[in-house]
């Protein structure tokens, strides 16, 4: 699925504006794809909601994208989606190594790294209820096997998931909620274009 997913956006014969446009459109609803995947009972994780992380003794806090709980073990992981597709010439599209993480300097990503390393004093909350966490999960656009392994080893993530694999799972099981989401977004896009073109 990785090659197919990449080719959806990155085509050598197409103008660069195509990739920019598709990347922005996809970014509008990419988080919804993760939620639909996690809501499917066949997925290895379920989503408990957006987690808030903060360190004891510090005033600031960070809210991340997901709280993934393993359906097998019950372990809980804050998770963040980083799906930068066309940005800087697709430099961060496919995860191949740790250097691609270095430009993420915002507090939320730092909190994710703290959770991955199980930093003492880190507290997590979902819907204002404190929860125990067992690490952290990174969700990328696509990744090589080596890229996953290197990042897990270097940063301590419990797993590196990709939205490309999630889409493949949803396609394989013909997920009705996923198909509804995509068809709805396609309808909205067509309605906009039709309106801009005007009558006949």
Q: Where is each model-derived feature located?
A:
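Interdomain/boundary linker segments immediately adjacent to catalytic/signaling cores
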Residues: 1-42, 46-53, 200
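Generic structural signal of hydrophobic/aromatic residues within well-ordered alpha-helices
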Residues: 18, 22-25, 109-113, 122, ...
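Conserved catalytic cores of phosphodiester-cleaving nucleases, focusing on short active-site segments
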Residues: 38, 66-68, 72-86, 99
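Short, surface-exposed secondary-structure junctions/capping segments
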Residues: 38, 98-104, 176-180
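Active-site metal-binding core of divalent-cation-utilizing nuclease and nuclease-like domains
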Residues: 48-74
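Catalytic cores of nucleic-acid endonucleases
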Residues: 81-168
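Polybasic (Lys/Arg-rich)
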Residues: 155-199
């Amino acid at each position: 699925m990785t090659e197919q997913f990449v080719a959806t956006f990155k085509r050598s014969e197409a103008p660069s504006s195509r990739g920019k446009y598709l990347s922005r459109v996809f970014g509008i609803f990419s988080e919804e794809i993760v939620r639909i995947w996690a809501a499917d009972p066949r997925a290895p994780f379920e989503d408990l909601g957006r987690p808030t992380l903060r360190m004891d003794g510090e005033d600031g806090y960070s809210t991340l994208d997901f709280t993934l709980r393993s359906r097998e073990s019950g372990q809980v992981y804050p998770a963040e989606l980083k799906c930068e597709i066309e940005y800087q010439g697709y430099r961060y599209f496919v995860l191949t190594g740790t250097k691609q993480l270095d430009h993420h300097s915002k507090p939320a990503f730092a909190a994710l790294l703290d959770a991955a390393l199980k930093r003492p004093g880190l507290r997590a909350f979902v819907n204002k209820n404190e929860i125990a966490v067992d690490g952290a999960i990174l969700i990328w656009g696509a990744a090589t096997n080596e890229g996953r392994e290197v990042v897990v080893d270097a940063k301590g993530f419990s797993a590196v998931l990709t939205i490309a694999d999630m889409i493949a799972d949803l396609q394989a099981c013909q997920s009705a909620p996923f198909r509804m989401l995509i068809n709805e977004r396609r309808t909205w896009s067509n309605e906009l274009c039709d309106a801009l073109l005007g009558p006949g």
